[in-house]
Every structure is written in C-alpha cells, then in structure tokens.
Amino acid sequence: MDLTAFKSLKILTVLPWPDWLALIVFFIGWVGYAVFARRRSASSMSLLATTNHYRRLWMLQTTWRDVRVVDGVIVQNLSTSPSFFASTTILIIGGLLAVLGTSEKAAVLVKEIPFAAATSALVFDLKVLLLTGVFVYAFFRFTWSLRQYTFGALVMGALPDFRVFERGELSREEYADRAGRVMGLAAESFNDGLRAYYMAFAVIGWFFSPLWFVVGTAGVVYVLYQREFHSDVLAVLKSSP
C-alpha cells in the first residue's frame, strides 16, 4: 500500500462510519433536492415558478407606464432581504470562527447537553467547519442575489419610453421576458441562500448524534418540499388570474 492510500484511509478513520453515512445523506438530501426542485419546476408550478410568472407580468406592466417610480421602489424593497441576510450571515460566520478558537471548551460544554454524543475536539471542529461552510455558501448566494437585483434595476432604468413600445419599435413581450428572467434569477439565488439556512438546522443535529443529523436532514427536506410545492400561498397564487 502506497503512502497516498495510507493517508486516505487515515482520513477516513477520523470520523466513525455512522458520521460518514450521515454526511452522505446530508449532501445527497441538499444537492438532490435542489436538482429535483429545479427540474420539477419545469413541469409543475412550484412557488418559485409561479412567482416568476408574476415577475414577468410585472415587467410587462412597466412597459405601459409613463412614470415608473413605484417599480423602482419595489426593486429596492426586494433587494433589502438579501442584503439583510448577507449581513446577518457574516455575523454568524464570525461567531462560528470564534468557536473554533475555543473548540476544546465548547466540545466539553456540548458533552454536558443531554443526548449529545461525546466526541473529540477534532471531530467537533469538523462539525463547526461544516456549519461554517454552509453559511459561507449562503453568503455567496445572498450577495449574488443582491447583485442580480442591481442588474434588474439597470434593466428597468434603461427601459425606453412607453411610446416606443406603442410605435412597435421594441417588443413588450421580449422586454418582459428578459427583465422578468433577471428578477427571477435574483429570486432563485436568494432562495438558494434561504435553503442553506434551513440545511444549517440539520447540521446542528450532528452535534447531538449522527441519527439526529439524518432525521434533521430528512425533516428539512420535507419542509422545503411542502412549502415549495404544496403550501397554502402557492394555492392562492395559482388560483389568481
């Protein structure tokens, strides 16, 4: 056995096999649901697909308006959500990095919690690093959503006078498709960040035991599925004209 293979086996022994299985279930649940939701939205009206339809209708209405101040205010209000979450995520990441600096004391504190699994400081650090990685991903998605809303504001700012559309020099439908798609992409990025927040709650279960980690992952995926495809607000939006 060469040195590389030996090191690989040594890395695998850092975590017990139940923890490795729980990690695999976590990533399959997260990535798998993201792929499933995207493909399902193409054939079935999900919450995101339905709101994208309304975004396109909104952009189509802007082509008829002479004064578009209200539209600019709406875009600004929409961009405040990813901005708030991005700022909050930075604070969370900072707190988690601070925990890494006192991992031994934190690991001892976690051991005193009822039903919490007794682990070494190294394993505790790995759990904190995973949680930190989840929030780092969320931060990137929130900031990208914020930038995309900025791009959407630019598209609206470059919108010609409504008389240009009336004369047939530009197509209302093409503009609505383009601008609505930009707004939809911003919403999708924001949705990815929120999904990461949900998955972070599943990671918290890992501090108790691998079983709670798996149960938390399954529970979060179920909640995400119900809200995206079977929520009350989706039924209302789909029933609206």
Name every feature range the model reports, one short phrase each.
Residues D71-L97, F124, V128, L185-V214, ...:
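Transmembrane alpha-helical segments and their cytosolic interface motifs
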